[in-house]
Every structure is written in structure tokens, then in C-alpha cells.
Amino acid sequence: MKNSLYILFLLIFNLTFSQVNFQGLIKDVNGNNITGANVIAIEKESKILDGFGISNDSGFFRLNLKKDLDYEIKISFIGFKEEVFDLKISENLEKDFILEEQAEALDEVEIVYEMPVTIKGDTIVYNADSFNTGSEKKLADVLKNLPGVEINEDGVVEVEGKEISKITVEGKDFFDGDSKLATQNLPAKAVGKIEVLRNFTEAGQLRNVTNNEDNIAINISLKSGKDKFWFGELLGGVGNDDRVLASPKVFYYAKDFSMSFLGNNNNIGEPVLSRRDFYRFGGGFNNLNARNGTSINISSDGAGLGNLQNNQAKSIDAQLGAFNFSKTWNNDIWEISGFAILAETNNIIEEKITRNFTSGLIENTEDYVVQDNKQQLYKFTTSFIPNDKLQVEYNLLVKSAENVENTDLTSNSFRDSSSNPVIQPIETDEINILIRDEPSSINQELKTYYTLNEDNIFSFEAQHLSQTEDPFYRAVRDIQPFRDIIPLDTDQSKFNINQNRLVDTDKLEAKLDYYYILTPKSNLNFTVGITDVKQNFNSNIFQILDDSSELNFNQDFLNNDVDFNFRDAYFSFNYRFITGMFTMEPGFTINTYKSENIQLGNIENNSFTDIRPDLRIFMKLKDSESLRFNYTATNQFTDVNNLAEGYIFNNYNSFFQGNPKLESAKFYNYNLNYQSINIFNFTNVFANFNYSKRSNTIQSQTLLSGISSVRSAINSTLPTESYFASGRVDKRFKNFKAGFNMNFNYSNFNNIINGSLAEQESFTQNYRASVATNFRDKPNIEIGYSYNKRSYDTGDFKNYFYTDSPFVKIDAYFGNGFVFTADYSYNYYRNESETLNEYRFLEADLSYNKEGSKWEFAIGVKNLLNDTSVNRDSFNQLYSQTRSYIIQPRYTVFKLKYDLTSIAGS
């Protein structure tokens, strides 16, 4: 690490004193400043783009150039004649320029392609080759080079601190805009331009009457120059310990038709589509009633299967097959598109977990988990846009899965005695757990936008969800659990306990919006809508005896048959107006609620009306700087899962009993957001603060006995608050970039444990700083450090965990075709008294692609230092937890890739 810092310091020192500044003002013939003019410097001998800049709102530009080197300077702006001249300087130079308008506008497409950055209204266009260093393999690598663009830990693209709404390719949806599929599968060589579309909306009629500051999309323009073309790659690999990789990717694009095929079969830990991604994948369906003041959480993934930690496990086998298409007719008036995704993952998870319970017991478990997850997603979309006044769209999304998880678990319980630790456990239980579910859903959506005239706009949207979940749970164990609840037959060799569940959900949402344009800077919005939910919940617990017969328990508290109905009819009004630098949008919503749940012969009815104000203030300090405030109040309702009165297994040592008398909770949220995106000097600043408070909270009431708990839900007037703050600064220089970010998350809440009130706090702090080189003709290195502190306070127990993580990343293009990349991180994980674990990650790849050749040869090594385990910690109202899980060992993979662009059509 010290050597890396020393090398980086020498590079910065050497380059700082071997460069000079070329700066000045750019104006038109009338003396007006020209904002957004491109200034580029090309080395005359090598023809390499060595520097570029953009004039700011004062017309000022600055370039850092090498001393005594011959450059060709080009200054251009759309609608003006280009200024081209040669330059060679040995000291700082300041010079102003006047651009003349030309009779005919320059070809905008040509300018966008040649210039590194072009700004057109809310759109920023980056020329990928101007930022690439030569080591890029996929779209994610290209995007990471761009200022203000990040790829987060989940593989989702963030621009200007916000998750993007979608990614399109040549204006066509790529798997409905899913950024993870696009960034991991589009070859970097095919990327020509990246268009960042700010204030994005798919309904053009609503652009000037709705708030879209949080909506950002990315469009990828491909390198081709042809009306019809194929591209893609075939990738294969083999390694030690029977490691294999096969990944074909084929793409076809034409003006009126496009299609893509993605395949992947690997056991080297490369993610394709995880079970978590499956539930996240919305297929482009938006939260229809996000602003109506009502939230009802329709639970999914009810089986409670485990998720991978950062795509790490002892073994990961993954398969993916995906097809995407789009077809248009009559100059894009009518379009149909869709996709099919089939994925399967087979994971082996081996982990050790230590839980410190508030009851004073410590539980150590050793888990061996085998997961088999199969997912299918199908999407069909058709849209009809005959003119700029009418837009109609229909969407259909079908999802299904088959998930099976087998766990062999050993649980040892100890009394907490730091001064005199107990060697022998007070209880040991061998448990085999089977969890299985086959969820499915059909989601339909209809959207219609109609502009009657310049003052009247109508919007109608409706969604219908039909969902079925059937989680099954089985635990075979040595020790009888929950003796006071389940009347098990004790004259058996083991206790074989089973539970069936079936949850059917039917949800309809619809709303009609009317926008009345008062002036070019103000409008009224009237909305009427409805949310209607119907659910049926069935469950039963039974025991399988040694002779394979079933012992069914007929007690009401061990079975469920619940019907739940919920309806919200609402009217909302918002007044949006612009005055000076402010965009104001006060409003209110009137909701009429009615809910009913029927179980055990009893009917629980609840109905009431609520008026909820909301306020949004947007302050535009500059074109690139803004401050935003949002206030919302939301009624939060639970679904049938929290209302069912019969007992439900959460896991082997936890029962849950619903409460049919639960009422809605009130959620108040205050958000303040600041951002400054300076495209002229590539400095970005983001800050966010969020405060939330709940009243009549739905919270836990728990009976804890040893390591076993029975939890129920109640409404409580006890305060529940949370604070979240984050900030990020990143700065890009000519050959360097630096960044710093931090976030704080504090929550204070109350629970009732064994009849006693327990006030609990959680406070998490994260800091990350990095500095990196950004050369086109030299190796690049990034050095950084992250620090994480987590504190958990349950009143009687306090736990503190710390993780220090320095990291180094290297990528180098050299030798006319060689690319070397390496990624190293060291993690020092500890609590206040001892080191809990130290682990490192080191991955390295070396590839060779001869210029002009379609073949690429590569060798990659995963987990080069052969570390064996990784730690994570977490906290809830009953215990704090430290988890250590086994990761894949070191292995080497030899790869061969063929570029399918060689079979491109005409």
C-alpha cells in the first residue's frame, strides 16, 4: 500500500510540473458569453486527444497541456464556425476567442460524435472514446469513466447521485431498461456515445406539468454507421477444479427492428440474475400511486430464503438465457417489444453465526446451505403513438420461480459470561431445514396520455396484479421446540415439523389525472384514483411421524384461513408554479379507506377518511446547482401476512402471530437534497438529509425464552425516528480524479420484550475516499480507503463493530493489445475488544487482443491470496449478529473470446 501511494505521488508531482495552462474567454461577435463551447487539444504527432474543456456560463475555459508539444486546437459550438489553429507553448497562456455565426447550422450528429462532451438542453452527450483508457470490456467499464456516473454495489447505475430510470440502446428498451443487464452484457467496443437524459419522462405530454428532476435515463448509441448491423461476442473459459464459463452475446439493430440474445453458464461466481434481482425486477412497472398518501406493502418472497452476500459463497453455479426484441411500424407509430429471461442458480453457502441475545444467551450456529433457484420472466409491450397528442401503451409481465433451500444446521447455546466463559453449551440441536416455494405473478398495465389542446391534458393509468405464493417449511430436529404451543407427538426419533402456506393476491390500481395549464409557468393537477386489494391466506402446521403418517393439528391458533379486503378511493389536488428560481408545488389528498379481514368466524372492519397535505419546493440556484425540499405524510397499511392470527414459522427458533386488529401507521418524511453538477470543471457535489417519524407504529411485541421467540405485531404510540445523511464530492482533473463520500444512518425505536419496554438504537457510519489516475497512454491506478463503524444499543447491551478497508485497483493497456487489471482490498474487521477477522480480496486478469483481430486471449485469477471467509454483522430487537461465511477458493480461468462484429451485415 505504501509503495502504491509513493508511485501515485511521483506521478502527480511529475505531471504537475510538466504542464502549462491554456485558458481564455469565448464570446460571439456581439460580446455575449458562449456557454458550453467545446475546446479540444489533439497532439499533432500521435493524433491523440490530450485535453478538452467546456466553457462555463462566463464563457471561460481552461486546458492543461504539456510543455513544448505541438497541438491542434479546435473550438466549436453548434451554430458557429469552428476555430482551428496550431499551438505550442512553454508557459501559461491566456487568449480570448470570438466565434462567428454561420448561415447554416453544423451537423449536430457529427459534432456530438467528435466532441468529448456536448450539452443540448437537459441532455449531456459523452463520446465514449474520449474517456476510454483502452482496458474497458463492458458497458459498466465505460460508464465508470464518465464524470458523475457511478455503479453501486448492486450493479445499478447512478447518475448525479440518483439511480437511473432505465437504459436504452439506440432508443430501444434493453430488457425494459434494466441497468444491471445492460452494464454487464453490452460490449465496450460497441459503445459510441452515452446520452444522459435528465428530467426524463416517457410521456412527452407531461414533461412541463410534472416534476422529473429525479428521473434520469441513459441512451447508448452504437458504433456502426450502418442501417442494419450485427455485433456481439462469444466467450468461453476453463479453469482448475472443473471451472467453466460459456457466454454468447448476440445483438442485431436496424431502424425498425432490434433483438438481443444473452447466454451465460458459469461456476466461477460471475452473477447473472440472482433471486434478489428476480424480486427487484419490475419490468418497467412504476409505483402507480406513489403520491396518493397510501402505502400497502404486498409481501413477496415469503419463504424467507437466504440471499448471497455481495455475490460471495462457497460455490456458485449460474445459467442464464435471455432474449429481447423490438419492432416498429409506420415511422414508430406502432411498436411491440418484449423479452424472455430464464435463469438458474445453484449455490452452496457455508457459514458460522454468533448471536448475542438480549436474554443473556449466546447462540453459535454452523450452517451448510444448498440452494437451487429457477426464475422465469416474460414481458410484452405494445405502444401506439399516432401523433403528439395521443399515446397509448399496454404492458404484460409474467414472473414465476422454483426455489428450494436445504440447510443442515448445528445450534449451540451458551450463557453469556465474559469473565468466566462457559465451554460446554447448555443446549445443542441438530436441525435439517427444507424451504420450498413456487411463486408466480401476472402484472398488467394500461397507460393513456391525451392532449386535448394546449391548456388541457389527460392521463389515465391502471395496473392489475395477480400473485400466488406457496412457501413450504420443514424442520427436522433433535429438540422439541415451542413446547407450550405445538402439541407434538414426543414418542418419535426426531421432531419432523412442517408448515404449508398459500397466499393469493389480487390488486387493482387506477387513476385519472387532469392537468389544466394556467400559464406557461403554472398548472393545476386534479387526480382521482382507487386501490383495491383482495387477499386470501391459508396455512397449517403438521408433524410427520416415524411411520411417514401425518399428524395434523386442528387448533385454531395453528391454522389460518383469512380473507382480507382493502380499498382506498382518493382525490388529490396540486398547484405547480414557477416564480424566479423557485418551483413550488403545494397540494393535498383526501383518502377514504375501508378494510375488512375475516377469520375464525370473526369480521374486523375499519373505515375512515383522512386529509393529507404535501409540499415540494425546488430551488434552481444555477443551471447546474439546485436545492430541493420534500414533505410527505403517508398512511401505511399492512397486508394479510401481519393480520393472520394463527402461528407462522419465521425460522427454526422464531414464531410469528398476526394481529387482526392492526390499524394503519402514519409516516412523516422530510427530505432536503442539494446537488451541484459542474460539467465545466468536472466537480460534482451531492448532499442529502432525510428525517422520518412514525406514529401509531406497527411494532413488535416479543416473548423471548432463551434463543426462541414468539413475536406479534401491535400498534404503538411509542416514538420511532430515523435520520439519514449522505454527502459526496468528486473532482476530475486532466489526468486524475478524486472522490470522497460519507453517510450516516441513525434509528431510534422501541419494542416490547417479555412485557418490558426496550428502547433500541442503531447508528451506522460509512466513509470512503479515493484518488485515481486517468491516463490514456499510461497504466492507471486507483487507491482508496473506506471505514465503517456500526453501533447497536439495546439498553442492556452495546455492541460496536469496525471495518477498515484500504483498496487498490490497477488497469493498464500496454504492448499494443495487452490489458492487465487487478483489484485488491484488505478488510480488518473487529469489535472493541478483539480482532474478529482479517480477509483480503485480490483478483487479476491479463488479456491480449491484437489490433485488428477478432480473437482475444485472457487468463484470470480469482481470490489470488486464497482467503477463506468474510464477515458481516447486523442487528435487530432481539440480538446482534456476526456472520462469517466461506467464499470460493483461488482458481485460475483461461478465456477465449471472439468478436462477432466480423459477421456484421450491410
PLM regions and their residue ranges:
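Outer-membrane beta-barrel transmembrane domain signature of Gram-negative proteins
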Residues: 497-585, 597-602, 618-622, 717-728, ...
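Conserved C-terminal beta-signal and adjacent last beta-strands/turns
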Residues: 768-787, 799-906
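Short, acidic Ser/Thr/Gly-rich low-complexity loop/linker segments typical of extracellular
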Residues: 45-60
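Short, ordered, surface-exposed loop/turn motifs in non-cytosolic proteins
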Residues: 30-44
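Membrane-proximal, glycine/serine-rich, low-complexity loop/turn segments characteristic
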Residues: 19, 25, 31, 60, ...
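A short, solvent-exposed loop/turn motif at the edges and junctions
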Residues: 42-48, 70-85
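Outer membrane beta-barrel strand-and-loop segments of large Gram-negative receptors
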Residues: 366, 507-509, 553-559, 657, ...
